[in-house]
Amino acid sequence: MSGNTSENILGTFDGSSWYWHNKRNISISPAQLAIIFAVLGLVSLLIGSVFYWYGASLILPFSVLEIAALLIAFVYNAIHANDYEKLTLTSDAVHIERKIGLTLQQVQLMRSMTRVDKTSLQNQLIELRQGHQLAYFGQFIHVNLRLALAKQISARMISPVI
């Protein structure tokens, strides 16, 4: 969970709509992570080169393999570093936007016909239902806070947007 916990639960009002914008909790910037991976790769390459210099020629290919694994891990982390989900509550609609990896999903529900399921939240995402259409929210909120978030969203849906 990112940012201020109360803002993540209570939501933010921008004058015309309520919204909840939650992001993945990452404590290190991509630039710092790139530096760490580069240093680890250089150390591994240095160790492999020293062993190669002394005649142990099979260590260097494994060092290169290790660097490739580090590169794959860095790319995976970079793809998911900007994951987020956003729920926007306007006067007539509920918009849910979720970016996971390279995939962007958007769902729009009619506010007057949408219900928030607050009963079955034990270790599950918040379920917003409009008839047979389902949408989920709360992936980046701690499990213990999801019920409070669901209650807050439900309360904001009942009250009119000023």
Predicted regions and their residues:
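Helix-adjacent hinge/juxtasegments
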Residues: 63-90
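Hydrophobic alpha-helical transmembrane segments
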Residues: 53-66
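General beta-strand recognition
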Residues: 19, 95, 125-127, 136
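A membrane-cytosol interface segment of integral membrane proteins
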Residues: 128-162
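N-terminal membrane-targeting/pre-transmembrane regions
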Residues: 1-53
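Membrane-cytosol interface motif
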Residues: 81-107
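Phosphoinositide-dependent membrane-docking surfaces
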Residues: 94-96, 106-121
